[in-house]
Amino acid sequence: MYHQLILLALIGTIMANVIPFSLSNISEEYKEFIPEEVRNFYKGLTAEDKEILRDLASKHATFANEDAALEALKDKSDKLYKNAVELRNFVKAKIDSLKPDAKAFVDEVIARARSLRSDDGQKFDTDKIKQAARDIIAKYQALNEETKEELKVTFPPIAKIISNEKLKRVASTFLQKN
């Protein structure tokens, strides 16, 4: 179960940079697990900003890469673009600070999280998410203890999630259902 929580924490932290969403859809008791920088980004969004993000998310399959998506964002809102780049740079700096094994693991989690997004940008396939979680858990379990500790230190929300009993139960239940 410990490994499931690490996976969910990593995916949650990373997907905040990958997938536009509204913090209003998240229960207050879980918001504390979202990095402050991510919360601040979403708190500062106007209704127009959210609409721009939804529009771009629905077209995500048309962008060759993250830079192309950011350029499209810049065309729609320079302010939103600057805020998104700031958030991206924050996450990138954390990832770049990792040693090679930890960085490779996080890069793989990011790639897997991005692959879970549907072409229309709307719905997730729960079975694919569960399989991705199982695959990443297996890869996490294969990491050495030093790498696991580095991930916890670099991404503090992970440590919070690991110690939360309610989230442990939720993660276990989610991954057991078929």
Curated annotation (Swiss-Prot):
GO terms for cellular component: extracellular region. InterPro entries: Gp-FAR-1 (IPR008632). Keywords: Coiled coil, Lipid-binding, Retinol-binding, Secreted, Signal, Vitamin A. Its main location: secreted. The keyword Cell inner membrane does not apply. It is found in: Secreted. Residues 1-16 form the signal peptide. Not glycosylated. It comes from the Eukaryota. Residues 67-89, 129-154 form a coiled coil. GO terms for molecular function: fatty acid binding; retinal binding; retinol binding. Disulfide bonds: none annotated. Binds retinol and different fatty acids. Belongs to the fatty-acid and retinol-binding protein (FARBP) family. This is Fatty-acid and retinol-binding protein 1. The gene is far-1.
